């Protein structure tokens, strides 16, 4: 994510100072989101790792299912809420008037694809909880590379400016989420996702 921001900032420098300021002004909001989602995934991972270590396969499966369902509903809430309150958040942060429009554009696109960030963090949290830290790292590197390539394509080649920077980030995050969910769907472990059986287990 840091790499993505750096690349995006570099692309904005090529465009205008206003675009660079817009990316910088939304940094605290995005960092807070990432920290919040990482906290949720860590909490879920602690529970899953305890059940996994105790060989309680049924509880592992139920916890993973609950985590995915919770992520789905939270992603809807954050997407809708984020898009609508973006202008208010920027005003509360005293964002300069000359960059508030571009900052709002970036944030609205980012919130539109925030599900990718959430599912990647939750999925990677599950994988790390069962001892697989390799796949999340690979997918994170892959996401950073894709983000860099798309930044160059959208901003430099297509001249999409701030929209291109935001769209590149969203696409890269969604791809990493898809890869993470694919691993969880195809594994033979008790943490495998069975899409037809997903449900919330309120007893956990």
Regions found by a protein language model. Name each.
Residues 1-8, 12-13:
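Single conserved hydrophobic/aromatic residue that forms the stacking wall/gate
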Residues 32-35, 147-152, 177-181:
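Hydrophobic transmembrane alpha-helices of multi-pass small-molecule transporters
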Residues 10, 45-46, 86-87, 124, ...:
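Interfacial helix-capping/hinge residues at the ends of transmembrane alpha-helices
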Residues 20-80, 117-136:
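Small-residue-rich hydrophobic transmembrane alpha-helices
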Residues 1, 48-115, 157-204:
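Short alpha-helical transmembrane segments in multi-pass integral membrane proteins
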């Amino acid at each position: 994510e840091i790499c993505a921001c750096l690349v995006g900032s570099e692309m904005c420098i090529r465009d205008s100072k206003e675009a660079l300021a817009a990316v910088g002004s939304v940094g605290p909001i995005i960092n807070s989101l990432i920290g919040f989602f990482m906290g949720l995934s860590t909490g879920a991972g602690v529970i899953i790792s305890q059940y996994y270590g105790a060989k309680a396969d049924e509880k592992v499966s139920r916890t993973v299912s609950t985590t995915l369902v919770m992520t789905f509903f939270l992603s809807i809430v954050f997407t809708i809420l984020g898009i609508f309150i973006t202008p208010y958040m920027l005003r509360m942060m005293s964002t300069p008037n000359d960059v508030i429009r571009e900052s709002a554009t970036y944030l609205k696109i980012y919130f539109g694809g925030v599900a990718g960030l959430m599912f990647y963090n939750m999925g990677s949290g599950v994988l790390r909880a069962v001892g697989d830290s390799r796949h999340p790292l690979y997918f994170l590197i892959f996401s950073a590379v894709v983000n860099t390539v798309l930044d160059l394509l959208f901003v430099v080649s297509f001249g999409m400016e701030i929209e291109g920077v935001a769209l590149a980030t969203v696409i890269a995050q969604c791809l990493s989420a898809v890869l993470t969910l694919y691993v969880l769907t195809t594994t033979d472990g008790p943490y495998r996702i069975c899409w037809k059986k997903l449900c919330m287990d309120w007893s956990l």
